[in-house]
Amino acid sequence: MLGISNLCRYYQGQRRVCANKFYQKYVNHSDLYFFDLWEISANNLWIKLAFVLLLCLFEIISGLEYLGKMAQEILKQGIPANVLQEKANLFKKASANNKIKDEMPNALSLYQNHSFFQKLKHLADKKNLDITSLPGGREVEYKHLDAGHLLADTNVVIDVPLVPQLAARTPTDYNFGTSRDKSATALHVGAIEVVIQSYASSECDLMAGMMLVDTFHSRPENAIRSVYIVPIRGGMFMRALCFPNTLVPMDSDINNRFKVVFSLPNNDFPQGSKLGHVSINMAGCTTSLSKTYVPSPLLTEELGREAATVIQYLGRDTYAMQTSNVPTSDEISRMVFNFHMEGKLSMHKTGSLSSILSKSKSLRYTIGGSKPKNKLADKAHNEEAETSDSKGIIDPKDGNVFANPQTDTDLFKLSLDDTSSPKGSLLDTRFAQKKVLIPKAMAGGADLLSSNLYDVLSGSSFRASLALARTHVVEGKIRCICTINLPENTGCCLAITVNSSNRGQFSTDIYTTGSQDRILWNPACSKNCDFSFNPNPCGTAWSLEFLRRTKFHLSVTCVSGWSAQPQTDIAMTMDWYVSNKPCVPCIYNVGTPGQNVWVNRWMGKLSFPQGSQNQLKQMPLAIGGGAGAKNSILMNMTNAFLSLWRYFHGDLVFEVQKMSSPFIKSTVTFFIGFGGLPFSENLEDFPNKLIQFGEVQERVEITFTRKEFLTAWSTQVDPAGPVAGDGCPYLCAMVHDSTASTITGDFNLGVTLLRIENFVGIGRNPGIQGARLLGSMQAEAQGGVVRTTDGVYSTCFRVRTPLALKDSGSFTCDLIGGGITTDSNTGWNLTALNTPVANLLRTAAWKRGTIHVQVAMFGSTVKRSDWTSTVQLFLRQSMNTSSYDARVWVISKPGAAILEFSFDVEGPNNGFEMWEANWASQTSWFLEFLISNVTQNTLFEVSMKLDSNFCVAGTTLMPPFSVTASPDSRPLLGVKTSTPAKKYVGGSLQAGPSPD
């Protein structure tokens, strides 16, 4: 063993011992004694063990010597210690990359129609299958069926071949195939694999949408079987796999049943060029009259749940979805099943020389919860039933008694209770027409039409007029199409505005009327104007009576007069329709205003005279404080809503409207700056946007994103302070080149802040009195999620008792409407403040949510022992004597006291309530004070704040809010406030009862 065959030594009796059988040939030698090493005995066991241990030690020493020499060689040549291991790992990974193969399961694994030996029998000829000669129950599998090339286009439709093209059979009287009941009549499609080989670059971004469509279905919900999104990159194949589980008849249309529709959204190949090649793999099973397919558990349990998949060779940018349209029990209950079987034609003998052909009775049967669409069948179809059923209907009480109906018409199923809205073409849905006179001497600010919308729409006799008047629920928007045909050498700007309600002698300025829904129109640029709106901003439906009782208002105003005066007065025609577009609510939520806040804030009119002279126009973006007028401010709902926050920021989207003749040309640049900027040429170093209108271009939108503003800014500024010191941004405009034309007139632009995107509001705003003037050189202006501060109240009412009165007194605050009424005593000092909460409650047409109220009562300086005054407070929803109180408080605390409470505004219109509306008998919320001693309780302040659940919708047109000096203003830190408080005295425009 191991080369030691010559190892010999003496042992016992001087005999030579040899340890190898190789020398057994010397067994007859007289001097030697041979024995087998593996022969175990008690005498030689320890010798043999020692010999084996010696051999093992020798091998270990030899191995260590070899490893030492190899380590010295590696160190000598400088080979890193981990190189061999890394190469081994790379070789292991490389050897694991098997060749690409079809991923679709073979047909034998999808079905279990045959035994194992029968499947082996079919393996030999499965590649040469003639499906027309196969019997039923035979598994078939086709690989790499050519589906054609994928062409570079937006949408591409490719046929999915299931089998090779079937050869047309020659008609013959002989049948050499299988018997009729055994031959295949249909093919069950178990799996389809769509293989795409792309010709595009392997590093491109081309994506494709794929949709497997069953063309025998006409409705999309049934036709679409699988949807995929896959990358179309070159290199390895992309494979989309699905399991249709569909039986297809064996006829000439078998290869037209399924189609793959491709959508290539970012294709950059030349139009019509070859983008890739498509091939199809299919596995299925034939069926016949006597034998069907038997799916395997793999197909029914695993692959059926897996549905559509994408074999990923190109990464993970793949998506797949299998559609299903299984009906629910409710859908089945609404279906109507109609059965009809025609009678049999037979010949009957009527005499010895004559006979007739007659048809027996036809069968009709209906299953369903509702009557079929053809509710009254044709008389010809029911003729047999009417003649045969001459005895009438059997009475269910007594089978021997027959009840004869008095009418053949089912009155309950004539659809006389149809509540749907008028629908159809424009001719069918037009319900009113109004002509508005446009005078030839028209100037900016002229009111062309101001009326409640009901008065404009009622009294017409168009097709839909009566239908609209008799419909309780109209779900479509109101659509108005206006037409004027003006020459292009003139021009003007008309504003068509609608608002949910109005009060008193409201302002008709475009700032006030244009905050809800409006459109600005220059008839010289476009000959017609299409305007749609929802008259119920907090709901999805309306009615004509709803418009009448809520005083929904329509205004047509001239914003900018004629560029060139026409020779005669002009008539504008307004046609009114019920739109097929559904009404969509527009609700403003105080707690979660949303990312996009629609403002429709009129920023001002910019006039640039012709010539090369230039000037700077600035429009403040502190837009919460309203617009200033003489001794008053103009306010609308959206600006009051923004003023609830102390600061705000977002992306500002402006609409720039051309209001002069298209023949007057100019290029205007817009940029963001700060107040007090001097005019200089380098102002265009600011990031700016150049506006240049085309011939008939009427308007353009520009956006200044959040990146233009370093921080948020205030929604209100002190109107008495200097413009340069408010620290808020301005929208600036100036002429880039010059203004010129072949006709006279200025280049006029109207600027509107349409919406604020990505809106963020910060903090609550107690409010600032007053606002900067609207118009002039500075074209005007002033304003969630939201970071707010709880506990900030806005003072809305301040009442001081008469100094000469020594008895009891009473007054009432309309918490929603903003008015104050007193008893018959004179000398009351009443002040209603224009705070953000008060402005929003007055200008918002519809309100819903919780309002928190704080009442502060201040008394005169008398001793506690002399205090005798008691104040009773009554919270009511109506001032009628027949109405009950909602809550009552009694306060007799000497000196001063504070009362805090809350109430919920809830109404009939999707939870919203309108102030003092005739619709649904809506009222308001009133807080009535009854003071037993007005000389001791002398001053009352009512403050309010809105809960985060408070919502508003729609605008109420209001008169200008008065701003007058008040000598009775409460001092602040011992000094009179520099900003005068707003004062409403009983009998003034706002203090009296609400106008009708």
Swiss-Prot record:
> Which GO MF term does the entry hold, naming one?
DNA binding
Q: Which UniProt keywords apply?
A: Capsid protein, DNA-binding, GTP-binding, Host cell junction, Host-virus interaction, Inhibition of host innate immune response by virus, Nucleotide-binding, RNA-binding, Suppressor of RNA silencing, T=3 icosahedral capsid protein, Transport, Viral immunoevasion, Viral movement protein, Virion
Residues covered by region (Disordered): 368-398
Gene3D superfamilies from the UniProt entry: 2.60.120.20
The record's annotation in SUPFAM superfamilies points to: Positive stranded ssRNA viruses
Keyword DNA-binding tagged: yes
Domain of life of the source: Viruses
Q: What is this protein called?
A: RNA2 polyprotein
Give the organism the record lists.
Red clover mottle virus
